[in-house]
Every structure is written in structure tokens, then in C-alpha cells.
Amino acid sequence: MPPELKFRPMTRSELDILVEWAAAEGWNPGFNDAQIFWDTDPQGFIAAELAGELVGGGSIVSYDGRFGFMGFFIMRPDQRGQGLGKRLWFHRRDLLISRLQPPAVIGMDGVFHMQDFYARGGFVYSHRDLRFEGVGALAETDSDLVDLSEVPFEELLRFDNAHFPAPRERFLWAWIGQPGSRALGAKQDGSLHGYGVIRPCRRG
């Protein structure tokens, strides 16, 4: 009888294993990503186990029960093509739904060629993001940009709440203050109109 595929909460050390798998796939995760998202929602990481071994996993982070996000979905290379990932994906979706308050929305990262699969899980294509790599050069900072440390956190939180589906105070505080990063805000007429964070990754 073949071993049973089991789903369970992931441990913090197992998340580091997934980070290594992701890096091997060229995903280029940030150095601090795992800890920040873990601190945001420690229950938001699901492991797939086969015969006592970790064979896959992914995140199902809940923001205050009002918005959920599925990401970091990966299977160990030798366990792909057997339908195990599909079972894990739907388990994660259903578990995240159970953790949210209706009518909360779920977002997700995905790969473009799997849109039909995501659609079968109830997702609708929204937008596409592209990653570019290049060698930076020193340049002057635009006069409208300020260090985010100069912006009161309450003002940043109000701006973020107006543009993100749910409050994420704990995540935001950690995200803008992570080691080695630079966080900038765009101000016009004294008001915050945007912000961004550049963070160190495996490559870049």
C-alpha cells in the first residue's frame, strides 16, 4: 500500500527548507521574507508530508481574517507530476477559506501558463507582474521622495489601509524596517501618495 499524503502545519525550520527549494528554482526570495511572513501569521504555512518526509508546502496567510493570500507553493522536484501538488493546492485553498470571514477575497501568486488550473479553483485573472534584473547605478533621489522613517507610522498605516484589502500593521512595521532595506515614501503637497521598499535578496 503506498504511503499516505498528509497535510499539517509547517514548522519554522521547514519553511527554511522551502526557501532553499525556491532559491534553486530561481525565485530569488528576500533574506527576511520568511521570518516576516511567519511572524505575520505562523498558522499560515502548510506542509505536505509523505512517508515522514517533507515533499511540498505553501503559504495561506490571513490578514485579520478579511483578506487571504496563497503563495510560496512548491513541491520537491522528485515528487512532481504525480498529482500531489494539486491535492496540496486545493487543501490550502479550502483551509484558507475556512480561516477567513465572508466575503473575504483571496489573492495568489501564480505562473502564467497555469491560469486554467487556477480558474478551476475559482480564481479570476486580475493582473500580471514581471520581474526585471539589472545593475543599478548611483543617482540623485527625487525631491518628492523621503525616507519612510520620516513619515509618521500612523500616516503610512492609513495610506496602506486605503489601498490594501485588510489591516496589516504588524507586517507593515516589519516590512519597512527589515535589515539592509531602504524604504521611501512619495509625498505631494505634504501628503503621502505612495511608498516602496527595496530589500536584499539572494541575488541583488
Sequence positions of predicted segments:
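Short active-site oxyanion
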Residues: 5-6, 103-106, 144
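Active-site rim helix/loop that mediates acceptor-substrate recognition in acyltransferases
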Residues: 15, 19-59, 161-183, 187
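Conserved acetyl-CoA-binding loop-helix of GNAT-fold acetyltransferases
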Residues: 72-75, 81-96, 120
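Conserved GNAT acetyl-CoA-binding A-motif
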Residues: 96-111
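Hydrophobic, ordered structural segments
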Residues: 107, 115-118
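Amide-forming acyltransferase catalytic core, primarily the GNAT-like/NAT-type
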Residues: 121-203
